[in-house]
């Protein structure tokens, strides 16, 4: 737990340091003005926070409350329909994404898969499909590219979503709508797609 908090603090301090450096650079006359943060650094930093939150929710909350846990609050796909229900990790992730979309249009993110339980969570653009295929075939690597949607060019990054707990594999392998039922711990189950509009 202390290690997880230390990592979270390190990420927070790094982001503060980056912001502080950019502010300092814009106020120092001899230094060139900083236009913005590199999209790769931006998306990598966002993913680090998302991954930490998702992993901790899965391991520290859902795993402890599930069938082998306290059974006080019940993580369930249909959590709204049962007494003391709560969201599954993927649903919590989507709820966060929807809340962010209401606050800013500086970036969007979603959880997608080549083997989605819900069809709406499959790839919708060629770069999403290419990214999901790449991370599935190259474990531990990320995928980066640019795509034009409408009149806007986006920097799109796809990061592996790995089964961090048996709660992940059991849920997917046992689900009646899952197109893949042999996931193993540590395997790539899908990807986190982060999209950032690029300045014209």
Predicted regions and their residues:
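Hydrophobic helical h-region of N-terminal Sec-dependent signal peptides
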Residues: 10-11, 15
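The canonical Cys-X-X-Cys-His
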Residues: 164-176
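C-terminal motif of bacterial Sec signal peptides marking the signal peptidase cleavage site
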Residues: 18-20
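Extracytoplasmic c-type cytochrome modules immediately beyond a signal peptide or single-pass transmembrane anchor
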Residues: 23-163, 177-200
